[in-house]
Amino acid sequence: MAAPDSETALFETLDRLHVKRQKLEHKPVFTVAESDEIHHALPGIHTKNLFLKDEGGAFWLVTTPADATIDVKALRHKIGSKRLSFGKSEAMAELLGIEPGSVTPLAVINDTGGKVTLVLDTTLTGETMVNIHPLRNTATIGLSGSDLVRVVVDLGHPPRIVDVADG
């Protein structure tokens, strides 16, 4: 789980960087399918996240549009990794301080050891509103794609920007 002060630190970072955002508190959601109500309440593009580990032991956090189709076998070639599989929830908790359902690119705030490589789908970077969790699945915040990139760079995790989705 996220450290008690992680969300506070995250919002302090957003404020320091003057990131404009919308925030919606809601019931817990664990899957993209469960988040339909949020999609109607918040304009913009909604996301899904994959926490992956390659056979070399490297961890990857991949964020794409919620409706994107992702071929994990093809993804490894796009990001230059070895064979990929889904990372275990224990590793996600240890490295990113979050649990399944709360996955977000903003969780890199907790990866102080730099063990996770963040990958953002190219589509997200040009969007005016990208909706993501703020380290918990009971809220969603919307910020611009360019601000998302600025924030994760400020957190020491410059993302790899790749055409992740198939098609």
Predicted feature locations:
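Extended, low-hydrophobicity, polar/charged segments
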Residues: 1-167
